[in-house]
Each structure stands twice: as C-alpha cells, then as structure tokens.
Amino acid sequence: MEVARAVADRASIAYILQKRPLGLGHAVWCACELVCYEPFALLLPDVLVQCKGKGCLAQMLDVYEAHGGNIIAVEPVPDAQLHSYGVVGIGEGNGSVFPINGMVEKPKPGTAPSNLTILGRYILQPEIFDILSAKETGTGGEIQITDAMIRLLATQDFHAVKYEGRTFDCGSKLGFLLANV
C-alpha cells in the first residue's frame, strides 16, 4: 500500500475506454488525444516483467536517450512458439541493443526473421497515430500495432532491447500461476 501511495503522489493516471475490441492498434489509437502527439511508453498489463537490477522501462529509456526513435523490448522464445508472437528481425548490435530491420506478426512456422519476440513494452513516436488512424486491419481482422510499426519502420529507426529479466504472460492460465508462485 505504501508503494501505491508513493506512486499516486507523483503520477497522474488516466485511462481510455476502448468501446469495441478492434485490436491493440485500435486501443493505442484511442489514446491519441491523451498522448497529445508526443513520444510515449506503452506497457501491456498482461505481461509481468521481473528484471534483474534496473527495470525494463528504465533499460529502454537508457536506449531511447542514446538512440532516439522507437524502442521495443524483446525476448528470445523457442522456435515452436514464435507463431504466437510479433517477431523482430535485427541487425548487428552491441550486446543487448540491436537495430530492427523487420517485423512480422504471428509468423507461419519457419518464416520468422529471428527468435526475438515483442514482449509488450514499447517507446513509440507519435507518428504511429497517423498510421493507426487509417484503421487498416491485419492478422485476425484486427488493427495491429505491429502492422503500424512495420509501416513506421520505413521512415523511422527502431531498436530492440534484450532486457535482463524474465516475463510472465498473465494472459494465460499457466503464466498467471507462474507469476504468483
């Protein structure tokens, strides 16, 4: 409870209601006016990130300060599970930071550009809203944030951060249980 009070004293929290489930890209687009066309961090709440040392977003902010552009936290996943995630293709990097040269949402088996998956932590530039405003649907008939990022990649730099830590996908029963053990 002390943590909640400390955060409440220093933060302003707002929410936007997505009236229809049209995809993550649509949910982000719904927040456009709240973000006021500024760079922003997007943290998906169904992914719990347990880091060693510095938090995941803090690691990402360090990369943002050094490189600017768009930053995505990634983690390696076994090849058999890649079809369930957004996957990035990367160039030469320096340990835990890599330039992104491609992305694909839920690739078919054997077509993923790497084993690095997007884990639900992003720092994005506001031009993403221009792309999302077209409301083009992608995988599953939804407005996908990954599809919008692929288009933005044509004009802006993206970097992947292989954060130090572990994630729990609380959107699955097993992930939720593991997060609570």
Where do the language-model regions lie?
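Conserved alpha/beta core of the MobA/IspD/sugar-nucleotide pyrophosphorylase nucleotidyltransferase superfamily
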Residues: 37-39, 90, 96-101, 113-181
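Conserved core of the sugar-phosphate nucleotidyltransferase
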Residues: 48-130, 135
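A generic structural signal for alpha->beta connector loops
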Residues: 10-12, 67, 155-157
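Hydrophobic helix-cap positions at the C-terminus of alpha-helices
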Residues: 34, 63-64, 152
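Conserved N-terminal catalytic core of the sugar/cofactor nucleotidyltransferase
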Residues: 1-44, 48-52
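Short beta-strand segments
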Residues: 17, 42-44, 73-76, 162-163
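Short, conserved clusters of charged catalytic residues that mark active-site
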Residues: 26, 55, 144
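A short acidic, often aromatic-flanked loop/helix-cap motif at beta-alpha or helix-coil junctions
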Residues: 20-24, 79-80, 109-111, 167-169
